[in-house]
Amino acid sequence: MANEQHVELIKQGSEAWNQWREQNPGESIDLSEADLRGLALAKANLKGADLKKAKLQFSNLAGASMEGANLEAARLQEANLQGAQLENAVVKNCNFMEANLQNTNFQNADIQGSQFNEDVLFGQTNLKGANLLDASGLSVMQIQTSLVDKDTKLPEYLSDDMEDEDFLNSMI
C-alpha cells in the first residue's frame, strides 16, 4: 500500500513533488495502489518509485522521469506519457489503451503482458531492448514508427511479420 505522505505530496503537482524529492533524495517512494487518476505530473521525478497497481488513468506524465520504476499492473488508460523516461522500468501487465507514448523511452523495459490498442499513439517510441512478449493489441504500424533493435522482444503474433530481414533492417 502507498505511503499516504507520498500520495498527499504528489497530489500537489510536479513542482512541489520535485522540490520534495530534491530535499529527500534517499527516500524510497511508495505510491503502490494509489489513486492518481487525472493528475498533472508532467516532468515529475518518479525515478525508482513503486507505482505497482497505481491508478494513473488520464494523468499527464509527459516528460516524467520514471527510470527503474515499478509500474507493474498500473492502469495507464488515456495517460499522456509523451517523452517520459521509463528506461529499465517494470511495466508488466499494464493497460496502455489509448495512451500517448510518442517519444517515450522504454529502453530495456519489461513490458510483458501489457495491453495496447490501435488508439495508442506511437512515434519515435524507444523500444530498444524492451521485452514485449505476451503484450496484446500492438500493430505492425505502431512498431514501424518506433525505435527497435535486435534485442527488442516482440509478441509472437508480430514476430512472423518482423522476421522479414529487409523489414528488420529497415527498423534498425
What are these regions (language model features)?
Residues Q5-E8, E15-A16, W20-I172:
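Tandem repeat scaffolds
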